[in-house]
């Protein structure tokens, strides 16, 4: 999610705006060894129903969750932050990456740190909807059919390589994500709460993959891109592996920061973070701009605006504030929109990247002063 070296190349007359990246320290005016994830400087309090104690609790929970996850999982801080923002926003995430970058380990570590049950489904071409949500099985003793829950009945679900299965299979998962329940033979079965899905997909160019329909992609709050680790992170991975400590032992060292009920409580509290009218207008302008912006053939739905606002609330709370600002919206633009827009044929012929086009779009929107 890095900002292009020359983003104005796509929009020569664009006005400067805030950076569209979680962790690009240079664009935040920070030194490389500083972090833009949490604001250290005191900020004035604005009208909000979220009190100071709750705000401080959010920031503390974020720090502790990251510390626990890092006991087993190295690097990928954008993945960690984006996932936590989506989780406490009540959304789900789609993660695109090549195999071998530790996505399963991350999901397991997240489940441990949250005190939630973890489940995993490996999507394959022959996987059926009943393999995911469950099925009715005949009980010989009672001479009745009983429901046998599928692996989806957990709290933190890793849906691995979702684009390797046909549409009807991942459609069953996406329906459950939307409704919070699974329907089998006309009977509705509620899923545990909280229910959070981390779906992964290989790059679409990979062999044996199916392109997810736009309507299904829209159900994911964020699309996060997990890139290869930096040289320092890769060295740390090798050093940790050389200590001959089993992954199970590292996971066992993770202590729950929250209980499942507290996850639900904080998710509800995030709604109380104040959003100024000017910020609502800013989000609407960004989303509407995708529908007629050069090099975009298909724009984002209103669901994108809902995701931006709710994500900004949570990011502000993680940063220790009870009100959101444009600096909480801008970093979420790429993960919120990159899977909700389609490049025009001309842009594809020119080899444009969707992130570059969206960054230019963001720079063309005037940033409000609150």
Residue ranges and their predicted role:
Residues 86, 168-190, 196-198, 202:
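Conserved catalytic/switch belt of AAA+ P-loop NTPases
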Residues 82-85, 138-159, 187:
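Conserved alpha-helical scaffold flanking the Walker A/P-loop in AAA+ ATPase domains
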Residues 87-124:
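Walker A/P-loop
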Residues 23-32, 36-49, 56, 290-370:
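C-terminal engagement/docking regions of AAA+ P-loop ATPases
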Residues 55-101:
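Pre-Walker A (pre-P-loop) alpha-helix and adjacent loop at the N terminus of AAA/AAA+ ATPase modules
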Residues 54-59, 72, 209-210, 218, ...:
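Conserved C-terminal "switch" segment of AAA+ ATPases
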Residues 146-155, 184-201, 212-221, 225, ...:
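AAA+/SF3 P-loop NTPase mechanochemical coupling elements
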Residues 154-178, 192, 207-217, 228-237:
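Conserved AAA+/SF3 P-loop NTPase catalytic/coupling segment centered on the Walker-B
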């Amino acid at each position: 999610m890095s900002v292009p070296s020359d983003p104005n190349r796509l929009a020569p007359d664009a006005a400067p705006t805030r950076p569209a990246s979680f962790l690009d320290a240079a664009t935040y005016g920070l030194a490389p060894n500083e972090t833009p994830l949490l604001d250290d400087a005191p900020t004035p309090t604005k009208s909000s129903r979220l009190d100071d104690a709750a705000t401080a609790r959010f920031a503390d929970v974020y720090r502790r969750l990251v510390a626990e996850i890092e006991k087993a999982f190295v690097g990928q801080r954008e993945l960690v932050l984006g996932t936590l923002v989506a989780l406490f926003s009540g959304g789900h995430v789609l993660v695109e990456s090549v195999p071998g970058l530790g996505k399963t380990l991350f999901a397991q570590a997240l489940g441990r740190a949250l005190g939630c049950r973890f489940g995993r489904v490996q999507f394959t071409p022959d996987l059926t909807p009943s393999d995911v949500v469950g099925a009715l099985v005949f009980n010989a003793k009672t001479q009745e059919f009983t429901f046998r829950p599928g692996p989806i009945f957990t709290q933190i679900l890793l849906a691995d390589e979702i684009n390797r299965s046909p549409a009807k299979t991942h459609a069953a998962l996406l329906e459950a994500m939307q409704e919070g329940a699974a329907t089998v033979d006309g009977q509705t079965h509620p899923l545990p709460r909280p229910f959070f899905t981390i779906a992964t997909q290989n790059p679409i160019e990979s062999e044996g993959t199916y392109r997810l329909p736009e309507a299904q992609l829209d159900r994911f709050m964020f699309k996060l891109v997990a890139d290869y680790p930096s040289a320092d992170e890769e060295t740390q991975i090798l050093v940790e592996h050389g200590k001959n400590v089993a992954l199970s032992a590292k996971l066992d060292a993770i202590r729950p920061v929250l209980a499942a009920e507290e996850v639900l409580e904080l998710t509800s509290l995030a709604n109380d973070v104040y959003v100024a009218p000017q910020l609502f207008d800013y989000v609407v302008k960004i989303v509407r701009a995708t529908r007629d912006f050069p090099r975009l053939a298909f724009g984002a739905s209103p669901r994108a605006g809902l995701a931006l606002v709710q994500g900004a609330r949570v990011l502000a709370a993680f940063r220790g504030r009870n009100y959101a600002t444009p600096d909480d919206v801008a970093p979420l633009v790429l993960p919120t929109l990159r899977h909700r827009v389609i490049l025009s044929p001309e842009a594809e012929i020119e080899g444009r990247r969707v992130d570059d086009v969206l960054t230019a779009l963001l720079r063309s929107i005037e940033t409000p002063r609150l």
